[in-house]
């Protein structure tokens, strides 16, 4: 029985990519800088001491990161018996965003430029917002700027609740984000507004519209909920997910995977919010999975809760929790199953600003007869998609080189 489990540690980069300078990210290193902060006692909020990831280390994380950067992350070495194949990958895609990373690892790199709203203030063209407001029957909106999702709630959340006007904002990514209160504005109203925005944004080549619902009574207790929804454009060609689905296989999305691929190539969608619930749901879907199935989970909290918020200790806590549960996953795998752990970009919590960082990502592979040892540097995330295609005996992808026989 052949099954693939993909655990996407959203934003868990392992060192600056070869083209990081073009993004202002030279020297970024999500894993390395978290490990350094932990070793120096600077990440002791809710945890203590050096970063402890024994199970990820067994799968080859420390060695993959060393191959990427030239040195071990602090607190890690070669004193672990490695049971998996490990490597690191550079990105071909033009951006350091979520869709680009996910699509590329499924065999479809983004070789064109996304559209962006580059102005930090008055970010959106009036022609665009006028069309959205007219179709939605709204008199105006708040925001119109680059912002951190939590900071803008503190700044504009109360005004939004009293005025009924949605909050429009963006970032360095190709995104149009809309924040609205679930109770005063209404969740379905927010989703309808996002669908309108998605349609009106088509000429602008924007990768995603993101619904950012929140609850609370004021700045002190505003909190985003798990009802986020991404409205992505479709990948420009068929991914390995599409190819497996067309060949009669199953592709199970856990968390926001289906949204990222615009629901293309997905046969089953499982909603879960938070690291614990996402891990629980992944285990349950693996238990249920039959032959020729991909179970694909995005562990978004690493990025949304800790990377963007530059919360080093929180990121470390989350990694240690994830690591503590890996034995549960390994125990479910048959000898033919293939486990893949990777990331879609970096989001170094020690870096300036609040945006993603252009980094290499780990490629950790276990099972399916793979011998423990180095996979080396992969020239594209697409090597993962090509390997999945090879594993399932599918038609080869246009991009990528397989590391699975």
Swiss-Prot record:
One of its GO terms (cellular component) is cytosol. It is found in: Cytoplasm. Its main location: cytoplasm. Gene3D superfamilies: Alkaline Phosphatase, subunit A, Phosphopentomutase. GO terms for molecular function: magnesium ion binding; manganese ion binding; phosphopentomutase activity. The keyword Metal-binding applies. One of its GO terms (biological process) is metabolic compound salvage. Pfam families: Metalloenzyme. Keywords: Cytoplasm, Isomerase, Manganese, Metal-binding. Mn(2+) 2 binds at residues 303, 308, 356. It is an enzyme of class 5 (isomerase). InterPro entries: Alkaline_phosphatase_core_sf (IPR017850), DeoB (IPR010045), Metalloenzyme (IPR006124), Phosphopentomutase_DeoB_cap_sf (IPR024052). Isomerase that catalyzes the conversion of deoxy-ribose 1-phosphate (dRib-1-P) and ribose 1-phosphate (Rib-1-P) to deoxy-ribose 5-phosphate (dRib-5-P) and ribose 5-phosphate (Rib-5-P), respectively. Belongs to the phosphopentomutase family. HAMAP family: Phosphopentomut (MF_00740). This is Phosphopentomutase.
């Amino acid at each position: 029985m052949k099954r693939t489990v993909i655990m996407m540690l959203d934003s868990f980069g392992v060192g600056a990519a070869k083209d990081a300078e073009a993004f202002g990210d030279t020297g970024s290193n999500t894993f390395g800088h978290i490990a350094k902060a932990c070793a120096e006692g600077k990440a002791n909020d809710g945890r203590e001491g050096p970063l402890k990831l024994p199970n990820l280390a067994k799968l080859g994380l420390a060695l993959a990161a060393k191959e990427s950067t030239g040195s071990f992350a602090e607190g890690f070495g070669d004193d672990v018996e490695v049971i998996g194949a490990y490597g690191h990958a550079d990105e071909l895609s033009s951006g350091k965003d979520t869709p680009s990373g996910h699509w590329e690892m499924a065999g479809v790199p983004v070789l064109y430029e996304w559209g962006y709203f580059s102005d930090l203030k008055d970010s959106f063209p009036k022609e665009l917002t006028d069309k959205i407001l007219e179709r939605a029957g709204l008199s105006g909106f708040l925001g119109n700027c680059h912002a951190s999702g939590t900071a803008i709630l503190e700044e504009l959340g109360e005004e939004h609740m009293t005025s009924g006007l949605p909050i429009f904002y963006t970032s360095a990514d190709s995104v149009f984000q809309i924040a609205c209160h679930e109770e005063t504005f209404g969740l379905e109203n927010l989703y309808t507004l996002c669908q309108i925005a998605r349609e009106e944004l088509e000429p602008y080549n924007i990768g995603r519209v993101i619904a950012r619902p929140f609850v609370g009574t004021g700045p002190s207790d505003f909190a985003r909920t798990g009802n986020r929804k991404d409205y992505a454009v479709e990948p420009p060609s068929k991914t390995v997910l599409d190819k497996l689905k067309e060949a009669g296989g199953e592709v199970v999305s856990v968390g926001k995977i289906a949204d990222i691929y615009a629901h293309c190539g997905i046969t089953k969608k499982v909603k879960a919010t938070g690291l614990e619930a996402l891990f629980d749901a992944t285990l349950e879907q693996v238990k249920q999975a039959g032959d020729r199935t991909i179970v694909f989970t995005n562990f978004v909290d690493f990025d949304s809760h800790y990377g963007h918020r530059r919360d080093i200790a929180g990121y470390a806590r989350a990694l240690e929790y994830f690591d503590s549960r890996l034995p549960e996953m390994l125990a479910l795998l048959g000898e033919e199953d293939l486990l893949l752990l990777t990331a879609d970009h970096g989001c170094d919590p020690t870096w300036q600003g609040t945006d993603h960082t252009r980094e290499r990502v780990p490629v950790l592979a276990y099972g399916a007869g793979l011998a423990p040892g180095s996979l080396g540097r992969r020239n594209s995330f697409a090597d993962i998609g090509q390997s999945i295609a090879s594993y399932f005996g599918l038609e080869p992808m246009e991009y990528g080189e397989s590391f699975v026989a």
